[in-house]
């Protein structure tokens, strides 16, 4: 398995991502939610760190992303930003913080930027959130869009199945993708859509298109850290590649520690003052 060390250690910006697309360099993106893990992810050379509303699932144990609040997202965002020197930090606007009206959306985005010091925000949707996008961008806040499977709309769709397989939905996705670029979004996430459609979107847009379950024809890839490191169990979508099995490693370490405490093997004389 190959490893990577970035040659350019300068801070990644939204403009750098667009430059990376123009020269054909793929963009690496991963979630992080706390200081310690964000520091490791950043030092590894990740281009983008997403403080995702998936924290609702992997950090809080919720079934969906819907329960997480703006205050909670800001807490996680603050923790991550403190650790990061190079990567671009993106914070998700959670469900209910921008769908109501554009004023509410702007207030939410401003809070995220002021309180976390993140580089930009991400939100889900196309035409239906046009006014919110325009209002946020007018305040000088960069936006990463998100189309395809949109977890905040799980109650509307009912499943986490692949989206945009039918012609009508695929056409709407194409229209929304172009709209997001025209409005001024600097990048777009496509989740769980046919690879051929995702490749077409990436080829038609000048902004970076980052996929999760969208094939290899896009400009970059994003995964949830807990999934790719093998911390979460019982979740194996087709698009997920596990690069470690930390759940087993952690289990072994914990049981070893418990055994050493019970047997009085820990602490030994060298581990005392």
UniProtKB/Swiss-Prot annotation:
Name of the gene: panB
Cofactor note: Binds 1 Mg(2+) ion per subunit.
UniProt EC number: 2.1.2.11
Function according to Swiss-Prot or TrEMBL: Catalyzes the reversible reaction in which hydroxymethyl group from 5,10-methylenetetrahydrofolate is transferred onto alpha-ketoisovalerate to form ketopantoate.
Annotated Pfam families: Pantoate_transf
Source species, domain of life: Bacteria
Subcellular location: Cytoplasm
Protein name: 3-methyl-2-oxobutanoate hydroxymethyltransferase
Keyword tags: Cytoplasm, Magnesium, Metal-binding, Pantothenate biosynthesis, Transferase
The protein's annotated pathway: Cofactor biosynthesis; (R)-pantothenate biosynthesis; (R)-pantoate from 3-methyl-2-oxobutanoate: step 1/2
Coiled-coil intervals: none
Residues at which Mg(2+) binds: 53, 92, 124
Any one biological process term the GO annotation gives: pantothenate biosynthetic process
């Amino acid at each position: 398995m190959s490893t990577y060390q970035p040659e350019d250690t300068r801070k990644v910006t939204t403009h750098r991502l667009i430059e990376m697309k123009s020269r054909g360099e793929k963009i690496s993106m991963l979630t992080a939610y706390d200081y310690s893990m964000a520091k490791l992810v950043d030092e590894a050379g990740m281009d983008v760190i997403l403080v995702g509303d998936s924290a609702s699932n992997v950090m809080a144990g919720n079934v969906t992303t819907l329960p997480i609040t703006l205050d909670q997202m800001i807490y996680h965002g603050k923790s991550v930003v403190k650790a990061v020197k190079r990567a671009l930090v993106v914070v998700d606007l959670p469900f209910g913080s921008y769908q109501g009206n554009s004023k509410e959306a702007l207030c939410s985005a401003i809070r995220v930027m002021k309180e976390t010091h993140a580089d930009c925000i991400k939100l889900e949707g196309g035409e239906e959130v046009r006014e919110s996008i325009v209002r946020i961008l007018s305040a000088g806040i960069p936006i990463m869009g998100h189309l395809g499977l949109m977890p905040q709309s799980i109650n509307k769709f009912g499943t986490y199945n692949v989206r945009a397989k039918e012609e009508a939905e695929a056409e709407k996705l194409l229209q929304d993708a172009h709209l997001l670029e025209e409005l001024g979004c600097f990048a777009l996430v496509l989740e769980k859509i046919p690879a051929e459609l995702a490749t077409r979107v990436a080829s038609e847009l000048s902004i970076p298109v980052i996929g999760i379950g969208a094939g290899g024809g896009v400009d970059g890839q994003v995964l949830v850290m807990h999934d790719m490191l093998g911390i979460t169990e019982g979740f194996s979508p087709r698009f997920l590649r596990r690069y470690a099995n930390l759940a087993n490693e952690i289990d072994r370490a914990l049981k070893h520690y418990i055994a050493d405490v019970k047997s009085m093997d820990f602490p030994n004389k060298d581990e005392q003052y």
